[in-house]
């Protein structure tokens, strides 16, 4: 691809994303499906703006690579060890059972048994990019089904290596004996990467961070991700697996959040490029000539994988309310099929249009997943948002709650329990199905679903409520919900949870003045108790706590328009000096008041 053509392709991709994704969100079909439809529109079977699909698809796999690095950062080795049973138990069972069933079905058609085995393995894999994206959108990350889904995807990445090695054996083109020297070198190189990463990465990043130049840190992060991907590719292993390991090695480092921030914009853009490329690769010619075969294949593929995944989830002990989410989000074919089927085609395992038919089936199955998950959400909404049983006595006796609480995790539960104890009429919106089921058993008015959907807010009584308390885990969800409430329900008093100072600044900029930083108050209280244990009188410690709170809030408001680190640091130093002066001025006055203060500790 020439330089000018590459630039034109980049402009087209950006235009497709900017046009398709907001339209898809407006239609309620999700960003992933919007990317896929945009790819079909600009690809060789649509308007024909871009024809070199294979090269772009290979480049766009970097989106998956960046995504796996961020996932690795969220796990540490001890947590990964805890998942070993689900990775090598459920993950292995899913691949083997799905591959066996799908290979058997392919053998009933014109596929030779060797081609059927390769086809079954390729179709058994799921799309890491799509599944993880949808799990994040649906709030499945911290749920039992989300953890199990990640374990299955991780095993599928590990299965890439033996699957690719199996192709030449099935084609009869493998060497009579293995080159044990070459295999040994690859194993040593892989072990060397693990050891080197374990002991060298932190000192290297510490040295880079000492320069104080953010751009250099970002460049080093990109070098780490791309370098580990290329290194694993040279060993014949999965690039995504390499970056995942690099992320795990840095999961417990002090640079974890900075690394995540540096990578996140690249991950989002490249993931969008990946989905657009998948849409471009859809061969509409094969779809037109073999329409019935393709439709039946897609239905059978999705049905077989859902059946296998649902049964495994049941055997593993996943709650019944989460099994369909787990099965649905992994029901599609994956990006690995493109690599495996291309390798098999080069070994002449496929005949005629067999490879094209399989790839069309995989692509269309990926397009069904967002729609399938919407159907699952609707089914769950009907199941959990229906009327209460006759023997239940809900806190809300009518459809006019005083308060809507969004999220009922550790933070939201404290607020909800306080309101319930004071007989306030509340409605809770929660995305964790098991929590919804439990709370409805106790008679609480709970709705399952995404609170950023205006229709759900209306159903929950937002038009009649006085206040809404937002306790979402993700800051993006919080800000989106604030915007929706301000636009559609301007009468609501908005109270929100902020995870830290950055989120507090964003809330203040959005006009939300009633918020609470989740660790600030508890940290202040513990600090007050620490002052008392060090000999300070309880009255003086209480005043110190109040002064600190007021000054910190004033700083927070003053620094809203300022985001430069140097300004923040400079103002923080001034505030510390100001706080010390306040305490010194009040020392004598505090001593006079000590006699009138009763110790309460």
UniProtKB/Swiss-Prot annotation:
Please give the superkingdom of this protein's source: Bacteria
The disulfides recorded in the entry are: none
Asked if the keyword Membrane belongs to this entry, the reply reads: yes
- Membrane topology field: Multi-pass membrane protein
GO molecular function annotations of the record: glutathione-regulated potassium exporter activity
InterPro entries assigned to the protein according to its UniProt record, in alphabetical order: Cation/H_exchanger_TM (IPR006153), K/H_exchanger (IPR004771), K_H_efflux_KefB (IPR020884), Na+/solute_symporter_sf (IPR038770), NAD(P)-bd_dom_sf (IPR036291), RCK_N (IPR003148)
RCK N-terminal domain residues: 400-519
Q: Which UniProt keywords apply?
A: Antiport, Cell inner membrane, Cell membrane, Ion transport, Membrane, Potassium, Potassium transport, Transmembrane, Transmembrane helix, Transport
Give yes or no: UniProt keyword Transmembrane: yes
Under the cellular component aspect of Gene Ontology, which terms does the record hold? plasma membrane
Classification via SUPFAM superfamilies: NAD(P)-binding Rossmann-fold domains
Cell location = Cell inner membrane
User: Which biological process annotations from GO are given for this protein?
Assistant: proton transmembrane transport
TM spans (from-to): 4-24, 29-49, 55-75, 87-107, 115-135, 152-172, 177-197, 207-227, 230-250, 268-288, 291-311, 324-344, 356-376
PANTHER family, per this entry?
Answer: K(+) EFFLUX ANTIPORTER 3, CHLOROPLASTIC
Subunit comment? Interacts with the regulatory subunit KefG.
Q: Which family does it belong to?
A: Belongs to the monovalent cation:proton antiporter 2 (CPA2) transporter (TC 2.A.37) family. KefB subfamily.
Q: What the protein does? A: Pore-forming subunit of a potassium efflux system that confers protection against electrophiles. Catalyzes K(+)/H(+) antiport.
Record's protein name: Glutathione-regulated potassium-efflux system protein KefB
């Amino acid at each position: 691809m020439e330089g000018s053509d590459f630039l034109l392709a980049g402009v087209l991709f950006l235009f497709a994303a900017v046009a398709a994704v907001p339209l898809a969100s407006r239609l309620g079909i999700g960003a992933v499906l919007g990317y896929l439809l945009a790819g079909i529109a600009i690809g060789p079977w649509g308007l024909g703006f871009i024809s070199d699909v294979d090269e772009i698809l290979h480049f766009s796999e970097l989106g998956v690579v960046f995504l796996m690095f961020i996932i690795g950062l969220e796990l540490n080795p001890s947590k990964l060890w805890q998942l070993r049973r689900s990775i090598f138990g459920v993950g292995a069972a899913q691949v083997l059972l799905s591959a066996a069933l799908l290979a058997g079905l392919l053998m009933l058609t014109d596929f030779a048994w060797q081609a059927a085995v390769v086809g079954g393995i390729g179709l058994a894999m799921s799309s890491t990019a799509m599944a993880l994206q949808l799990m994040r959108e649906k709030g499945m990350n911290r749920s039992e089904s989300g953890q199990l889904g990640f374990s299955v995807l991780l095993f599928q990445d590990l299965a890439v290596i033996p699957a690719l090695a199996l192709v030449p054996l099935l084609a009869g083109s493998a060497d009579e004996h293995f080159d044990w020297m070459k295999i040994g070198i690859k194993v040593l190189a892989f072990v060397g990467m693990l050891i080197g990463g374990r002991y060298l990465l932190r000192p290297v990043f510490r040295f880079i961070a000492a320069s104080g130049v953010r751009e250099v840190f970002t460049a080093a992060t990109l070098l780490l991700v791309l370098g580990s991907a290329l290194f694993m590719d040279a060993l014949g292993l999965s690039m995504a697996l390499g970056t995942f390991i690099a992320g795990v090695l840095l999961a417990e480092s002090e640079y974890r959040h900075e690394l995540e921030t540096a990578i996140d914009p690249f991950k989002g853009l490249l993931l969008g490029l990946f989905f657009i490329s998948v849409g471009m690769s859809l061969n509409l010619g094969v779809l037109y000539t073999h329409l019935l075969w393709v439709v039946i294949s897609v239905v059978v593929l999705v049905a077989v994988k859902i059946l296998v995944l649902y049964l495994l989830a049941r055997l593993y002990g996943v709650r019944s309310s989460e099994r369909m989410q787990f099965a649905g989000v992994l029901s599609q074919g994956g990006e690995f099929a493109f690599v495996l089927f291309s390798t098999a085609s080069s070994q002449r395992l496929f005949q005629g249009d067999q490879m094209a038919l399989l790839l069309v089936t995989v692509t269309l199955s990926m397009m069904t997943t967002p729609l399938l998950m919407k159907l699952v959400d609707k089914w769950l909404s009907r199941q959990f948002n229906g009327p209460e049983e006759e023997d239940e006595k809900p806190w809300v006796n009518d459809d006019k709650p005083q308060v809507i609480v969004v999220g009922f995790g550790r933070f939201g539960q404290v607020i909800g329990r306080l309101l319930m104890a004071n007989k306030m009429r509340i409605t809770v919106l929660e995305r964790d199905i098991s929590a919804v089921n439990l709370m409805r058993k106790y008679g609480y008015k709970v709705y399952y679903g995404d609170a950023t959907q205006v229709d759900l807010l209306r159903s929950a009584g937002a038009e009649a409520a006085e206040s809404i308390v937002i306790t979402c885990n993700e800051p993006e969800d919080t800000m989106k919900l604030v915007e929706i409430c301000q636009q559609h329900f301007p009468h609501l008093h908005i109270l929100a949870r902020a995870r830290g100072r950055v989120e507090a600044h964003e809330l203040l900029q959005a006009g939300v003045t009633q918020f609470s930083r989740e660790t600030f108050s508890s940290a202040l209280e513990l600090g007050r108790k620490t002052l008392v244990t060090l000999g300070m009188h309880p009255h003086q410690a209480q005043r110190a706590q109040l002064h600190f709170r007021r000054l910190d809030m004033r700083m927070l408001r003053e620094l809203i328009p300022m985001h430069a680190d140097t300004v923040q640091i400079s103002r923080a130093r001034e505030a510390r000096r100001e706080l010390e002066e306040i305490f010194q001025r009040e020392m004598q006055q505090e001593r006079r008041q000590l006699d009138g203060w009763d110790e309460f500790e």
